[in-house]
């Protein structure tokens, strides 16, 4: 079983590390090509392209310029410990045991605009390059064209290595669009998280993102290997709703706190 999650915009390169183990990203040659393109952008161009403030654009221009391919624990950090968004709040990788990291390294993948696919312990240098950004490059007009089949092929390699054919899609639509489902040698299961609001169940972005992290943690902590085991997920008040679920989509609901 291979779990897919999105990266985060917020990064943490200061907190104490729970493990010193690390691996290196497998697609760094591609990352270098994107950095080459990104370095051509001025801070105002970055601000427009990414729809971010001038201050953030300046920070990210500096990151592109400082980036270099020789990753070490001194200039980079393990991806699962560097990302700090809502998904990662639910995941809480900073509390993982070494055995948890072992399982995650085999079964969890982070999709990335710059790095393509990251394993949890892959070192990464700080960046911001969302998958949906229209960064022109030698392979096309955006990052989807740049990555083409590369991400899908890398996921197929991971599935083959564990002798499995199930992908748990906990990534956002923006990131999962970088995967070619028809070329993926797997059944795709998508958990959906609905929260009650004024008597109606709907996707509330903040809660849904955190729930994706909670589900990832649930799979890792319990060493789950079969999709039917996911229905036991009950973290923070969520419960499986079989009636709302369908082939390939597992629906989890949570009542409003009153």
Swiss-Prot record:
Pfam families per record: H2O2_YaaD
The source's superkingdom equals Bacteria
What's a single GO CC term here? cytosol
The alphabetized list of GO BP terms reads: response to hydroperoxide
Matching entries from InterPro entries are given as: YaaA
Quote the NCBIfam families the UniProt record gives: PRK02101.1-1, PRK02101.1-3
Q: Which PANTHER family match?
A: PEROXIDE STRESS RESISTANCE PROTEIN YAAA, PEROXIDE STRESS RESPONSE PROTEIN YAAA
Q: Which HAMAP family match?
A: UPF0246
Family per similarity comment: Belongs to the UPF0246 family.
Supply the name of the protein. Answer: UPF0246 protein YaaA
Originating species: Escherichia coli O17:K52:H18 (strain UMN026 / ExPEC)
Lineage of the native species? Answer: Bacteria, Pseudomonadati, Pseudomonadota, Gammaproteobacteria, Enterobacterales
Could you tell me the gene encoding this protein? yaaA
């Amino acid at each position: 079983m291979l779990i897919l999650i999105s990266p985060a915009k917020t990064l943490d390169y200061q907190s104490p590390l729970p493990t010193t183990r690390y691996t290196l990203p497998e697609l760094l040659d591609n990352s270098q090509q994107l950095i080459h393109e990104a370095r051509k952008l001025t801070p105002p161009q970055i601000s427009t392209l990414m729809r971010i403030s001038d201050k953030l654009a300046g920070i990210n221009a500096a990151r592109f310029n400082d980036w270099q391919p020789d990753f070490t624990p001194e200039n980079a950090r393990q991806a699962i410990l560097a990302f700090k968004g809502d998904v990662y709040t639910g995941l809480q990788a900073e509390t993982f045991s070494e055995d948890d990291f072992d399982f995650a390294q085999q079964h969890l993948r982070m999709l990335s605009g710059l790095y393509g696919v990251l394993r949890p312990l892959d070192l990464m240098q700080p960046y911001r390059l969302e998958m949906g950004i229209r960064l022109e490059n030698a392979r096309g007009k955006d990052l989807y064209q740049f990555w083409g089949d590369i991400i899908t092929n890398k996921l197929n390699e991971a599935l083959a290595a564990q002798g499995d054919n199930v992908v748990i899609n906990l990534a956002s639509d923006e990131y999962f669009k970088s995967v070619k489902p028809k070329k993926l040698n797997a059944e795709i299961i998508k958990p959906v998280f609905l929260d009650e609001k004024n008597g109606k169940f709907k996707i509330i972005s903040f809660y849904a993102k955190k729930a994706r992290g909670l589900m990832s943690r649930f799979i890792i902590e319990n060493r789950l290997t079969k999709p039917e085991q996911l229905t036991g997920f009950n973290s923070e008040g969520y419960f499986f709703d079989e009636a709302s679920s369908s082939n390939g989509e597992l629906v989890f609901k949570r009542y409003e706190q009153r």
